[in-house]
UniProtKB/Swiss-Prot annotation:
PROSITE patterns: RIBOSOMAL_L6_1
Keyword match Cytoplasm: no
Protein keywords: Ribonucleoprotein, Ribosomal protein, RNA-binding, rRNA-binding
Subunit structure: Part of the 50S ribosomal subunit.
Gene: rplF
The species this protein was found in: Polynucleobacter asymbioticus (strain DSM 18221 / CIP 109841 / QLW-P1DMWA-1)
This protein's GO CC annotations: cytosolic large ribosomal subunit
Protein name as catalogued: Large ribosomal subunit protein uL6
Function (record text): This protein binds to the 23S rRNA, and is important in its secondary structure. It is located near the subunit interface in the base of the L7/L12 stalk, and near the tRNA binding site of the peptidyltransferase center.
GO terms classed as biological process: cytoplasmic translation
Keyword Kinase: no
Length: 177
């Protein structure tokens, strides 16, 4: 069993967990998430604490225990506090505007980019050059942030483009004669 898989998950108040065989459902103030666990691992719930249990002694079960624990923990955190990714737009004329279920981006192309947000993900634009993507599903929030960044990823000479707030862009030196 992996070290991550051995550590228990504490379930905060406001989160309900129902285990039906390999299907795990977590309900909280920010929504409901479900996940099917690998057949070699299971979950045991007692006194508001979840632990991962191995269904067999195969090496695969030990490897899957850490993955299962991390996924269920992300579900618990997602429905109680949620996840967010912050993006910043660097460049002249680069702007973003959140309009309901869509995100309008001006990234130096001849046309505006309209990005339709998936269900369960929200976007905010506190300023024109800042985007905050929020949601309860960690994978989905990261996927949306990566797709928005892919429209104009930071270029290596001036650093212009869409970048994560905590991202460090290493700039190349220009060619010398």
């Amino acid at each position: 069993m992996s070290r991550v898989g051995k550590s228990p998950i504490t379930v905060p108040k406001g989160a309900e967990i129902s285990i039906n065989g390999a299907n795990v459902t977590v309900k909280g103030p920010l929504g409901t998430l479900t996940h099917n666990l690998h057949p070699s691992v299971g979950l045991k719930q007692e006194d508001g604490v979840l632990t991962v249990v191995l269904n067999n002694d195969s090496p695969e079960a030990g490897a899957q225990s850490g993955t299962a624990r991390a996924l269920v923990n992300n579900m618990v955190v997602g429905v109680t506090t949620g996840f967010e990714r912050k993006l910043s737009l660097v460049g002249v004329g680069y702007r973003a505007a959140a309009q309901g279920e869509t995100l309008k981006l001006q990234l130096g192309f001849s046309h505006d980019i309209i990005y339709n947000l998936p269900k369960g993900v929200k976007a905010e634009t506190p300023t024109q050059t800042e985007i905050i993507i929020k949601g309860s599903n960690k994978q989905q929030v990261g996927q949306v942030a990566a797709e928005v960044r892919a429209y104009r990823s930071p270029e290596p000479y001036k650093g212009k483009g869409v970048r994560y707030v905590d991202e460090v862009v290493h700039l190349k030196e220009t060619k010398k004669k």
